[in-house]
Amino acid sequence: MLPAAVCGQTLDECQVAAEQNYPLIKQYGLMAQTTEMTLSNIQKGWLPQISAMVQATYQSDVTAWPSQMQSMYSQMGLQMEGLRKDQYRLGIDVAQTVYDGGIIRGQKDVSREQGRVDEARMAVTLYDVRRRVNEMYFSLLLLGEQLKLNEDLTRVLAANEKKLESMSLRGTASEADYKAIRAERLTVEQQTESLQSQHRTLCDVLSAFCGIAVSAPTKPAACEALPAVPELHPEMKAADAQLRLADAQKRLLDARMMPKLSVFASAFYGYPGYNMFDDMMRHRWSLNGMIGARLTWNIGALYTRKADRAKIALQRSMIENMREVFLFNNRLQQLRQNRNIARYRKLMATDDEIVNLRQSVRKAAESKLAHGITDVNDLMKEIHSENVARLQQSIHEIEMLKELYDLKLSTNN
């Protein structure tokens, strides 16, 4: 169910409503939550890493006393069995990172920049929503103007039809002339019905797109395009976000080359323990533990470092190229739009005069018909010429406004 229509929806209102109604807008909140959860998970890398372990093994061989020592112990009355081949261990290990070389910070930076890239790409899509609104909005305005002109044309034809009917009854005009202009009026009314159907359909489509009931769009005022600000365009912001992501990935790559320092503690209950000699003499479970510090350096990261850096450099080059392509196409688009605006303004400069002249010619034809100097075909020709002139005047105005507001989008103003 769409909200109730308000009188005179403006272009800005429709654009804002369309953005808020577009399903993709919901992803803004979802993206923010996803990024926040990812950052929270990465930050947990500073928490102690705890692992529990249960182990049971049977070995093919174990540490044993030399045979000479076993003989000596036997002579002394001692039974030295040595270690058993079945061994058991229940343990827990705790490790705490002290210095990770900047990996966690780098991962958080990459996650943040990835979130910004996703948001920037979505902003580009939402910016295109405004262009789609422009297309429908100005098409609706043009249909509205055509309906008004058809109504005016119907009134003119109806007035002349009435005159010809009267003249036909008096015998000063033929019945065929009356029927011809009546048929023309009915044809125009059919066209009006078709235009009204198109108008209703486009209203419904724009209403569904914006999420509000659009029935009476107002003609926007002619605006002057401000100087272009390309760096603020969503496409440029998306490219900047991708470049920052590439920089963050490069920093993370460097961080993976740094040594890492951690402290750890390990404890287990089982057999054998750390006191090997005691366990060789007595087969019993014992509690054992140790603490320490560990410095590690993953030299294996060197294997792919060169290729990884080259890949990031290529990504940056591709992004820069995309920026250049966008700026090139955007400049061409602005050039075309400015030329079209200038063309429509030049045409509009003489539209009023053409309409006035066509109106004068049409009125003269009506007078000639009343005095029997011309026929109805000449009159209908002049009526249509006047209507075409008025239609062209409306088209020039609406198309110029559309080009102005499309240029406003192109220049991000």
Task: Describe each model-derived feature in a short phrase.
Residues 13, 37, 122-237, 244, ...:
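Periplasmic alpha-helical coiled-coil/stalk elements that build and connect Gram-negative outer-membrane
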Residues 80-148:
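Surface-exposed, polar helix/loop patches in the mature regions of secreted/periplasmic/lumenal proteins
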Residues 184-212, 356-413:
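Short segments within alpha-helical structural elements
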Residues 26-30, 43-44, 98-126, 176, ...:
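Sec/SRP-type N-terminal targeting helices
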Residues 53-93, 264-297:
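Small/polar, glycine/serine/threonine/aspartate-rich low-complexity segments that form flexible
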Residues 6-51, 55-61, 172-174, 207-249, ...:
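Bacterial Sec-pathway N-terminal export signals of envelope proteins
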